From Swiss-Prot:
Underlying gene: rnfC
Domain 4Fe-4S ferredoxin-type: 359-389, 399-430
Protein species of origin: Methanosarcina acetivorans (strain ATCC 35395 / DSM 2834 / JCM 12185 / C2A)
Recorded GO MF terms: 4 iron, 4 sulfur cluster binding; electron transfer activity; metal ion binding; oxidoreductase activity
Protein name: Ion-translocating oxidoreductase complex subunit C
Keywords, sorted A to Z: 4Fe-4S, Cell membrane, Electron transport, Iron, Iron-sulfur, Membrane, Metal-binding, Repeat, Translocase, Transport
Enzyme class: translocase
Residues at which [4Fe-4S] cluster 1 binds: C369, C372, C375, C418
Gene Ontology cellular component annotations, sorted alphabetically: plasma membrane
GO biological process per UniProt: electron transport chain
Length: 447
């Protein structure tokens, strides 16, 4: 771990800039969510404007795709996305034209219409689920959690905190959920101060710590507020850690194989709350969001990026690479994915880009498992990482499902302690991908 990034490199990222320089090309994947890919609505040579719908799909799990740029469609072809998959994408040559579609606000819409607006806007949660589906899981839900434990992303939206809070209220209204809990890191002093100074319906927000058995329910029983804020430890809850978020904040532990809606909880992000505000109050689809760029770049910072902008253009906006890059990782050095090309675009669930130098990249050679069970000892989800990885290595993905591979939060603890240097996280992630592919193929076959 000595060669991992130092915290001081990411500590001074209070500056948030919007990338105004147009990329030479924009790559807009027709699938930016966990579901069926959209079909392109445009053809090669077509002129598009900002906000125009580029992709539409049918089914129960969809997220429409819109153009963040004016420009010309260069091609429609398979292009790599940040996860390494080749996805059918609309490739644009952006132009300086500022023309947009007519954005129509619908501030007084009823709840059923609010859900439809969120759906039409193509808003996707940081864990890749379309927001309109997350808000209506088909189960009884009593609490909406906003995961604001990514400090640098949360800081990017503090200047528009009133809009984030209004968007969160609209999500509660659209879903019919009675109460909301905003979760901050306990050491994120800047965000805690901002939320303490914020008001909802003219009243200051209640900001309370999660201590011992005092979970969010403890405070919700004593206040009449619809929304409260809690400071919950020093953990950043990544997309794979929603079960831990529900357990640690609400005190509702989930058995293996279950998800937060099974204990009456739904999770959303800060970015989606702001996007919901933009969709309902300004009529705008989901076109851009905040991304944190850290590591071996000359000017680490948080930037507001339009979806479809290649990663290399984002890094150039941060001063370019510092030295020769060894690895570029999207969405965190532990649980993220290393991209094989910086031509891959920023997409709706991108929250961060980490650049490592060659000296920082660990390239240990994997050997045979010695069955020491250290991976079992450290797994926070009480899984058998070594066993799941072995099954994945043999292509036995049904067995991986039986061993609850989908419950892995990809924290990396097992890989860190493994004396055989097995690529446990990569193998388990591969098994999860194959399991989800089988699920999607089954869904497509039945529709």
């Amino acid at each position: 771990m000595k060669r991992s990034l130092h915290s001081k490199e990411v500590a001074n990222l209070s500056d948030v800039i919007k990338i105004d320089k147009l990329p030479e090309k924009a790559i807009i994947p027709m699938r930016q969510h966990d579901g069926i890919a959209c079909a392109p609505l445009v053809k090669k040579g077509a002129e598009v404007i900002v906000g125009q719908k580029l992709g539409e799909c049918e089914g129960s799990d969809l997220a429409y795709v819109h153009s963040p740029f004016c420009g010309t469609v260069n091609s429609i072809e398979l292009m790599p996305n940040p996860s390494g998959k080749r996805i059918l994408s609309v490739v644009l040559t952006p132009s300086e034209c500022a023309q947009t579609v007519d954005f129509v606000p619908e501030k007084d819409a009823p709840p059923s219409r609010l859900i439809e607006i969120i759906k039409e806007a193509g808003i996707v949660e940081y864990y890749e689920k379309p927001t309109y589906l997350a808000l209506k899981p088909g189960k009884r839900i009593d609490t909406l959690l906003m995961n604001a434990t990514f400090p640098l992303i949360t800081h990017a939206y503090l200047s528009s905190l009133d809009k984030v809070l209004e968007g969160f209220k609209l999500m509660l209204e659209a879903s019919g959920i009675s109460r909301g809990v905003i979760v901050l890191r306990a050491d994120d002093k800047e965000s805690i101060k901002a939320f303490k100074n914020a008001k909802v319906d003219g009243k200051p927000l209640t900001v309370a710590p999660i201590v011992g058995m005092r979970h969010a329910d403890y405070y919700l029983e004593d206040v009449e507020d619809q929304i409260i804020v809690v400071a919950a430890g020093k953990i950043t809850y990544t997309p794979t850690m929603m079960n831990l978020l529900s357990a640690n904040v609400m005190g509702r532990k989930l058995p293996l194989g279950y998800e937060p809606p099974d204990v009456h909880v739904v999770v959303c992000g800060v970015k989606s709350a702001k996007a919901v505000y933009d969709a309902i109050n300004e009529g705008k689809p989901y076109l851009e969001s905040a991304v944190t760029v850290t590591g071996a770049v000359n000017n680490p910072k948080t930037v507001i990026v339009k979806f479809g902008t290649p990663i290399k253009d984002v890094i150039e906006a941060c001063g370019g690479y510092k030295g020769e890059p060894g690895k570029v990782i999207v969405n965190g050095s532990m649980g993220g994915v290393a991209v094989y090309t910086d031509e891959a675009p920023v997409v709706k669930n991108t929250v961060g880009i980490v650049v490592q130098t060659e000296a920082e990249v660990l390239r240990d050679e994997a050997t045979v498992c010695i069955h020491c069970a250290r991976c079992v000892d450290v797994c926070p989800m009480n899984l058998l990482p070594g066993r799941i990885a072995a099954m994945a290595d043999m292509g036995m993905f049904d067995r991986c499902r039986e061993y609850f591979a989908l419950n892995c939060i990809e924290c990396g603890e097992c890989a860190v302690v493994c004396p055989a240097k097995r690529h446990l996280v990569q193998l388990i992630r591969y098994s999860k991908l194959q399991i989800m592919n089988q699920k999607n193929e089954t869904v497509e076959a039945t529709e």
